[in-house]
Design a protein with these regions (language model features):
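C-terminal motif of bacterial Sec signal peptides marking the signal peptidase cleavage site
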Residues: 15-19
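A residue-level marker of the well-folded mature domains of exported/periplasmic proteins
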Residues: 20-408
Protein backbone atom coordinates (compact mmCIF):
# COMPACT_ATOMS: atom_id res chain seq x y z
CA UNK A 1 0.00 0.00 0.00
CA UNK A 2 2.86 2.37 0.81
CA UNK A 3 4.47 1.75 -2.60
CA UNK A 4 1.13 2.35 -4.29
CA UNK A 5 0.62 5.55 -2.35
CA UNK A 6 4.12 6.70 -3.25
CA UNK A 7 3.41 6.11 -6.93
CA UNK A 8 0.15 8.04 -6.80
CA UNK A 9 1.60 10.99 -4.92
CA UNK A 10 4.68 11.11 -7.10
CA UNK A 11 2.43 11.20 -10.17
CA UNK A 12 0.30 13.97 -8.74
CA UNK A 13 3.44 15.83 -7.74
CA UNK A 14 4.72 15.71 -11.29
CA UNK A 15 1.48 17.29 -12.51
CA UNK A 16 1.49 19.99 -9.81
CA UNK A 17 5.12 20.81 -10.60
CA UNK A 18 4.58 20.97 -14.34
CA UNK A 19 5.07 24.72 -14.19
CA UNK A 20 8.52 24.18 -12.74
CA UNK A 21 10.11 22.72 -15.84
CA UNK A 22 13.53 23.42 -17.23
CA UNK A 23 13.84 26.77 -18.95
CA UNK A 24 11.13 28.40 -16.89
CA UNK A 25 11.81 31.00 -14.23
CA UNK A 26 15.30 31.77 -15.58
CA UNK A 27 14.82 35.53 -15.53
CA UNK A 28 15.74 37.58 -12.50
CA UNK A 29 12.10 38.43 -11.81
CA UNK A 30 10.49 35.09 -12.66
CA UNK A 31 11.43 31.87 -10.96
CA UNK A 32 9.92 28.92 -9.14
CA UNK A 33 9.81 28.50 -5.37
CA UNK A 34 9.32 24.91 -4.26
CA UNK A 35 7.05 24.28 -1.27
CA UNK A 36 7.10 20.89 0.46
CA UNK A 37 4.82 20.33 3.45
CA UNK A 38 4.81 17.17 5.57
CA UNK A 39 1.25 16.03 6.16
CA UNK A 40 -2.27 16.12 4.83
CA UNK A 41 -3.67 14.80 8.11
CA UNK A 42 -2.86 17.89 10.21
CA UNK A 43 -5.36 20.62 9.20
CA UNK A 44 -3.02 23.61 9.31
CA UNK A 45 -0.78 22.70 6.37
CA UNK A 46 -3.43 22.70 3.65
CA UNK A 47 -5.80 25.23 5.20
CA UNK A 48 -3.32 27.89 6.31
CA UNK A 49 0.37 27.42 5.50
CA UNK A 50 0.07 26.51 1.80
CA UNK A 51 -2.26 29.32 0.69
CA UNK A 52 -0.55 31.89 2.89
CA UNK A 53 2.91 31.09 1.55
CA UNK A 54 1.62 31.11 -2.02
CA UNK A 55 -0.07 34.47 -1.50
CA UNK A 56 2.99 36.04 0.09
CA UNK A 57 5.37 34.78 -2.61
CA UNK A 58 3.04 36.26 -5.24
CA UNK A 59 2.94 39.59 -3.41
CA UNK A 60 6.74 39.75 -3.18
CA UNK A 61 7.43 38.38 -6.65
CA UNK A 62 4.43 38.69 -9.01
CA UNK A 63 6.09 36.66 -11.76
CA UNK A 64 7.24 33.83 -9.49
CA UNK A 65 5.51 30.46 -9.30
CA UNK A 66 5.07 28.09 -6.36
CA UNK A 67 5.43 24.37 -7.01
CA UNK A 68 3.70 22.57 -4.15
CA UNK A 69 3.68 18.96 -2.93
CA UNK A 70 2.58 17.23 0.27
CA UNK A 71 4.50 14.21 1.57
CA UNK A 72 1.56 12.59 3.42
CA UNK A 73 3.88 11.81 6.36
CA UNK A 74 6.23 9.74 4.19
CA UNK A 75 9.92 10.65 4.28
CA UNK A 76 10.69 8.65 1.14
CA UNK A 77 8.05 10.50 -0.84
CA UNK A 78 9.38 13.83 0.41
CA UNK A 79 12.90 12.99 -0.75
CA UNK A 80 11.48 12.20 -4.19
CA UNK A 81 9.62 15.50 -4.19
CA UNK A 82 12.74 17.42 -3.19
CA UNK A 83 14.88 15.77 -5.83
CA UNK A 84 12.22 16.47 -8.47
CA UNK A 85 12.19 20.17 -7.56
CA UNK A 86 15.98 20.33 -7.90
CA UNK A 87 15.91 18.58 -11.28
CA UNK A 88 13.12 20.78 -12.61
CA UNK A 89 14.91 24.01 -11.80
CA UNK A 90 13.39 25.49 -8.66
CA UNK A 91 15.50 28.42 -7.53
CA UNK A 92 14.60 28.15 -3.83
CA UNK A 93 12.81 25.52 -1.75
CA UNK A 94 10.76 25.86 1.45
CA UNK A 95 10.48 22.51 3.23
CA UNK A 96 8.98 21.23 6.46
CA UNK A 97 10.76 17.91 6.82
CA UNK A 98 8.84 14.75 7.69
CA UNK A 99 12.13 13.32 8.98
CA UNK A 100 14.95 15.84 9.37
CA UNK A 101 17.68 13.19 9.22
CA UNK A 102 16.21 11.33 6.25
CA UNK A 103 16.01 14.56 4.24
CA UNK A 104 19.66 15.46 4.82
CA UNK A 105 20.93 13.90 1.57
CA UNK A 106 18.34 15.84 -0.44
CA UNK A 107 19.31 19.11 1.27
CA UNK A 108 22.93 18.33 0.40
CA UNK A 109 21.90 17.64 -3.21
CA UNK A 110 20.12 21.01 -3.33
CA UNK A 111 23.25 22.71 -2.02
CA UNK A 112 25.38 21.07 -4.70
CA UNK A 113 22.90 22.31 -7.31
CA UNK A 114 23.03 25.83 -5.78
CA UNK A 115 19.37 25.69 -4.75
CA UNK A 116 18.98 27.32 -1.32
CA UNK A 117 16.68 25.61 1.17
CA UNK A 118 14.54 27.33 3.82
CA UNK A 119 13.68 24.99 6.69
CA UNK A 120 10.10 25.62 7.76
CA UNK A 121 8.82 24.88 11.27
CA UNK A 122 11.36 22.04 11.77
CA UNK A 123 15.11 22.50 11.33
CA UNK A 124 16.17 20.07 8.63
CA UNK A 125 19.69 18.71 8.78
CA UNK A 126 22.21 19.61 6.12
CA UNK A 127 23.30 22.98 4.68
CA UNK A 128 20.02 24.91 4.91
CA UNK A 129 20.17 28.62 4.11
CA UNK A 130 17.49 29.85 6.51
CA UNK A 131 15.09 28.67 9.19
CA UNK A 132 11.77 29.98 10.47
CA UNK A 133 9.85 28.51 13.36
CA UNK A 134 8.59 29.35 16.82
CA UNK A 135 10.59 29.25 20.02
CA UNK A 136 10.02 25.61 20.94
CA UNK A 137 11.28 25.97 24.48
CA UNK A 138 8.74 28.73 25.05
CA UNK A 139 5.98 26.47 23.69
CA UNK A 140 6.87 23.91 26.34
CA UNK A 141 7.09 26.53 29.07
CA UNK A 142 3.64 27.88 28.21
CA UNK A 143 2.20 24.37 28.39
CA UNK A 144 3.92 23.61 31.69
CA UNK A 145 2.76 26.86 33.31
CA UNK A 146 -0.81 26.34 32.13
CA UNK A 147 -0.87 22.79 33.47
CA UNK A 148 0.40 23.86 36.89
CA UNK A 149 -2.17 26.65 37.05
CA UNK A 150 -5.01 24.34 36.04
CA UNK A 151 -4.08 21.67 38.59
CA UNK A 152 -3.81 24.30 41.34
CA UNK A 153 -3.81 23.40 45.02
CA UNK A 154 -6.37 20.62 44.57
CA UNK A 155 -3.69 18.38 43.13
CA UNK A 156 -1.18 18.65 45.94
CA UNK A 157 0.89 15.75 44.68
CA UNK A 158 0.65 16.92 41.07
CA UNK A 159 1.05 13.54 39.42
CA UNK A 160 1.10 13.91 35.66
CA UNK A 161 1.41 11.89 32.47
CA UNK A 162 3.70 13.44 29.87
CA UNK A 163 2.60 12.80 26.27
CA UNK A 164 5.43 13.89 24.00
CA UNK A 165 5.47 14.18 20.20
CA UNK A 166 7.17 12.13 17.54
CA UNK A 167 10.79 11.40 18.54
CA UNK A 168 11.83 11.85 14.89
CA UNK A 169 10.96 15.56 15.08
CA UNK A 170 13.63 17.82 16.60
CA UNK A 171 10.82 20.02 17.92
CA UNK A 172 9.71 17.24 20.27
CA UNK A 173 12.86 17.46 22.38
CA UNK A 174 12.69 21.25 22.19
CA UNK A 175 9.14 21.35 23.59
CA UNK A 176 9.94 18.76 26.24
CA UNK A 177 12.99 20.68 27.44
CA UNK A 178 10.91 23.84 27.85
CA UNK A 179 8.14 22.03 29.70
CA UNK A 180 10.54 20.25 32.03
CA UNK A 181 12.19 23.57 32.90
CA UNK A 182 8.85 24.58 34.43
CA UNK A 183 7.61 21.23 35.75
CA UNK A 184 10.73 19.73 37.32
CA UNK A 185 10.58 19.75 41.13
CA UNK A 186 6.91 20.76 40.96
CA UNK A 187 5.31 17.56 39.64
CA UNK A 188 5.83 13.82 39.64
CA UNK A 189 5.88 12.42 36.12
CA UNK A 190 4.24 9.02 36.59
CA UNK A 191 4.32 7.99 32.93
CA UNK A 192 5.94 9.42 29.82
CA UNK A 193 5.25 8.41 26.22
CA UNK A 194 6.49 9.19 22.73
CA UNK A 195 3.62 9.43 20.25
CA UNK A 196 4.72 8.43 16.77
CA UNK A 197 3.73 10.83 13.98
CA UNK A 198 1.81 12.86 16.60
CA UNK A 199 -1.10 10.50 15.95
CA UNK A 200 -4.36 10.74 17.87
CA UNK A 201 -4.93 6.98 17.90
CA UNK A 202 -1.47 6.29 19.32
CA UNK A 203 -1.98 8.94 22.00
CA UNK A 204 -5.31 7.40 22.92
CA UNK A 205 -3.71 3.96 23.28
CA UNK A 206 -0.88 5.33 25.39
CA UNK A 207 -3.24 7.24 27.65
CA UNK A 208 -5.47 4.20 28.02
CA UNK A 209 -2.42 2.22 29.15
CA UNK A 210 -1.47 4.92 31.65
CA UNK A 211 -4.96 4.96 33.16
CA UNK A 212 -4.93 1.17 33.39
CA UNK A 213 -1.51 1.06 35.06
CA UNK A 214 -1.93 3.99 37.43
CA UNK A 215 -5.66 4.22 38.00
CA UNK A 216 -7.64 7.33 37.03
CA UNK A 217 -7.56 8.68 40.59
CA UNK A 218 -3.76 8.83 40.62
CA UNK A 219 -3.33 11.21 37.68
CA UNK A 220 -3.78 14.96 38.20
CA UNK A 221 -3.00 16.31 34.74
CA UNK A 222 -1.62 15.53 31.28
CA UNK A 223 1.04 17.45 29.40
CA UNK A 224 0.01 16.80 25.77
CA UNK A 225 2.50 18.12 23.21
CA UNK A 226 -0.06 19.12 20.58
CA UNK A 227 -3.78 19.17 19.85
CA UNK A 228 -3.87 15.84 18.00
CA UNK A 229 -2.30 14.15 21.02
CA UNK A 230 -4.66 16.04 23.34
CA UNK A 231 -7.60 14.69 21.36
CA UNK A 232 -6.46 11.12 21.93
CA UNK A 233 -5.83 11.78 25.63
CA UNK A 234 -9.28 13.27 26.17
CA UNK A 235 -10.93 10.42 24.28
CA UNK A 236 -9.18 7.91 26.55
CA UNK A 237 -10.21 9.82 29.68
CA UNK A 238 -13.83 9.84 28.55
CA UNK A 239 -13.77 6.14 27.73
CA UNK A 240 -12.40 5.42 31.21
CA UNK A 241 -15.22 7.43 32.78
CA UNK A 242 -12.91 10.06 34.27
CA UNK A 243 -15.11 12.91 35.49
CA UNK A 244 -14.46 15.74 35.75
CA UNK A 245 -11.85 15.57 33.01
CA UNK A 246 -8.24 16.25 33.96
CA UNK A 247 -6.34 19.35 32.84
CA UNK A 248 -4.87 18.65 29.38
CA UNK A 249 -2.62 20.98 27.37
CA UNK A 250 -2.24 21.23 23.60
CA UNK A 251 -0.58 23.08 20.74
CA UNK A 252 -1.56 24.07 17.23
CA UNK A 253 -4.91 25.83 17.69
CA UNK A 254 -6.77 23.19 15.66
CA UNK A 255 -10.44 24.08 15.32
CA UNK A 256 -11.62 20.97 17.14
CA UNK A 257 -9.19 21.77 19.97
CA UNK A 258 -10.53 25.31 20.24
CA UNK A 259 -14.03 23.86 20.50
CA UNK A 260 -12.87 21.46 23.21
CA UNK A 261 -11.49 24.43 25.11
CA UNK A 262 -14.84 26.19 24.80
CA UNK A 263 -16.57 23.08 26.15
CA UNK A 264 -14.12 22.83 29.05
CA UNK A 265 -12.60 19.55 27.90
CA UNK A 266 -9.13 20.87 27.02
CA UNK A 267 -7.31 23.39 29.21
CA UNK A 268 -5.40 25.36 26.58
CA UNK A 269 -3.60 25.31 23.27
CA UNK A 270 -0.55 27.15 22.00
CA UNK A 271 -1.20 29.36 18.99
CA UNK A 272 1.63 29.84 16.52
CA UNK A 273 0.62 32.49 13.97
CA UNK A 274 0.44 30.69 10.64
CA UNK A 275 0.50 33.97 8.73
CA UNK A 276 3.56 35.26 10.54
CA UNK A 277 5.53 32.09 9.91
CA UNK A 278 4.40 31.88 6.29
CA UNK A 279 5.32 35.50 5.60
CA UNK A 280 8.85 35.09 6.93
CA UNK A 281 9.41 31.85 4.99
CA UNK A 282 8.19 33.43 1.75
CA UNK A 283 10.39 36.48 2.36
CA UNK A 284 13.45 34.27 2.85
CA UNK A 285 12.71 32.14 -0.23
CA UNK A 286 12.17 35.12 -2.52
CA UNK A 287 15.31 36.86 -1.23
CA UNK A 288 17.35 33.71 -1.81
CA UNK A 289 15.79 33.20 -5.24
CA UNK A 290 16.96 36.70 -6.16
CA UNK A 291 20.46 35.82 -4.94
CA UNK A 292 20.26 37.94 -1.80
CA UNK A 293 21.24 37.06 1.76
CA UNK A 294 18.59 36.38 4.42
CA UNK A 295 20.71 37.87 7.20
CA UNK A 296 18.72 41.10 6.94
CA UNK A 297 15.56 39.09 7.70
CA UNK A 298 17.04 36.81 10.35
CA UNK A 299 16.95 37.88 13.97
CA UNK A 300 19.11 35.08 15.39
CA UNK A 301 21.08 32.00 14.37
CA UNK A 302 20.55 28.35 15.22
CA UNK A 303 22.64 25.20 15.12
CA UNK A 304 21.58 21.81 13.81
CA UNK A 305 23.57 18.61 14.37
CA UNK A 306 25.18 19.23 10.96
CA UNK A 307 25.22 22.99 10.42
CA UNK A 308 26.11 25.92 12.66
CA UNK A 309 24.92 29.52 12.57
CA UNK A 310 21.89 29.03 10.32
CA UNK A 311 20.17 32.44 9.89
CA UNK A 312 16.83 32.13 11.65
CA UNK A 313 13.67 33.81 12.85
CA UNK A 314 12.18 32.29 15.99
CA UNK A 315 8.71 33.70 16.49
CA UNK A 316 6.80 34.04 19.75
CA UNK A 317 4.01 31.52 20.53
CA UNK A 318 0.85 32.62 22.34
CA UNK A 319 -1.18 30.61 24.89
CA UNK A 320 -4.91 30.38 24.23
CA UNK A 321 -7.58 29.62 26.82
CA UNK A 322 -11.34 30.00 26.70
CA UNK A 323 -11.04 33.60 27.83
CA UNK A 324 -8.50 34.62 25.18
CA UNK A 325 -9.88 32.97 22.02
CA UNK A 326 -11.51 36.14 20.77
CA UNK A 327 -8.50 38.42 21.13
CA UNK A 328 -6.12 35.90 19.57
CA UNK A 329 -7.62 33.48 17.05
CA UNK A 330 -10.71 35.49 16.14
CA UNK A 331 -8.87 38.80 15.95
CA UNK A 332 -6.19 37.25 13.74
CA UNK A 333 -8.99 35.83 11.54
CA UNK A 334 -7.81 32.26 11.98
CA UNK A 335 -11.42 31.30 12.72
CA UNK A 336 -14.66 33.23 12.92
CA UNK A 337 -16.95 32.98 15.91
CA UNK A 338 -19.43 31.32 13.57
CA UNK A 339 -16.91 28.53 12.87
CA UNK A 340 -16.00 28.05 16.51
CA UNK A 341 -19.56 28.21 17.79
CA UNK A 342 -22.02 25.95 15.96
CA UNK A 343 -25.53 25.68 17.41
CA UNK A 344 -24.62 22.91 19.85
CA UNK A 345 -21.85 25.08 21.38
CA UNK A 346 -23.74 28.36 21.50
CA UNK A 347 -24.37 28.32 25.23
CA UNK A 348 -20.75 27.30 25.96
CA UNK A 349 -19.53 30.08 23.68
CA UNK A 350 -21.72 32.59 25.51
CA UNK A 351 -20.12 31.53 28.79
CA UNK A 352 -16.69 32.00 27.20
CA UNK A 353 -17.65 35.49 26.01
CA UNK A 354 -17.62 34.54 22.32
CA UNK A 355 -20.51 36.76 21.32
CA UNK A 356 -18.71 39.28 19.11
CA UNK A 357 -19.06 39.95 15.38
CA UNK A 358 -18.43 37.41 12.64
CA UNK A 359 -15.25 37.47 10.56
CA UNK A 360 -17.07 39.37 7.83
CA UNK A 361 -18.19 42.06 10.29
CA UNK A 362 -14.69 42.27 11.72
CA UNK A 363 -13.17 42.77 8.26
CA UNK A 364 -15.67 45.51 7.44
CA UNK A 365 -14.87 47.25 10.74
CA UNK A 366 -11.15 47.07 10.03
CA UNK A 367 -11.62 48.57 6.57
CA UNK A 368 -13.55 51.47 8.10
CA UNK A 369 -10.80 51.97 10.68
CA UNK A 370 -8.15 52.01 7.96
CA UNK A 371 -10.07 54.71 6.10
CA UNK A 372 -10.11 56.76 9.31
CA UNK A 373 -6.34 56.43 9.53
CA UNK A 374 -5.61 53.47 11.76
CA UNK A 375 -6.12 49.81 12.49
CA UNK A 376 -5.90 49.37 16.27
CA UNK A 377 -7.13 45.83 16.02
CA UNK A 378 -4.53 44.75 13.47
CA UNK A 379 -2.20 41.80 13.86
CA UNK A 380 1.15 42.78 15.40
CA UNK A 381 2.85 40.00 13.43
CA UNK A 382 2.17 41.79 10.16
CA UNK A 383 4.00 44.88 11.34
CA UNK A 384 6.96 42.70 12.30
CA UNK A 385 7.10 41.07 8.90
CA UNK A 386 6.78 44.46 7.23
CA UNK A 387 9.84 45.61 9.15
CA UNK A 388 11.73 42.51 7.96
CA UNK A 389 10.83 43.26 4.34
CA UNK A 390 11.82 46.92 4.70
CA UNK A 391 15.15 45.75 6.09
CA UNK A 392 15.68 43.51 3.06
CA UNK A 393 15.16 46.45 0.73
CA UNK A 394 17.17 48.98 2.74
CA UNK A 395 20.33 47.28 3.89
CA UNK A 396 22.78 44.59 2.86
CA UNK A 397 23.18 41.32 4.72
CA UNK A 398 24.41 41.43 8.27
CA UNK A 399 25.18 38.59 10.66
CA UNK A 400 22.35 37.31 12.86
CA UNK A 401 22.22 37.94 16.58
CA UNK A 402 22.37 35.35 19.31
CA UNK A 403 22.38 31.59 19.08
CA UNK A 404 19.74 29.00 19.81
CA UNK A 405 19.97 25.25 19.53
CA UNK A 406 16.58 23.66 18.80
CA UNK A 407 15.98 19.96 18.80
CA UNK A 408 19.12 18.91 20.67
Amino acid sequence: MRNALAAVITGLMAVSMAGCGEGEGEGDDAFTVGLLLPSSAVPRWERFDKPMIEKRVKALCPDCKVAYANAADDATIQRQQMNSLITRGARAIIVDAVDVKALRSSVQAADRAHVPVVAYDRLAEGPVSGFVSFDGAQVGRLQGKALLKAMGDKAKQRRIVMMNGDPVSPNTAWYRKGARSVLDDKVTIRKEYANLEWRTDIARGNMTAAISDLGPGRIDGVLAANDAIASGVISALKSAGVSPLLPVTGQGADLDAVQRIVKGEQTMTVYKSFRQEADVAASMAVALGHGRSVHAIATTTVDSPTTQDVPAVLLTPVPVTAGTIERTLVRDEVYSIHEICPANLRSACDRAGLTGPTTKDTKETKEKEKVKGGDPGGVPARAGVARHLQAVRRRPGAPGRGTATPGR
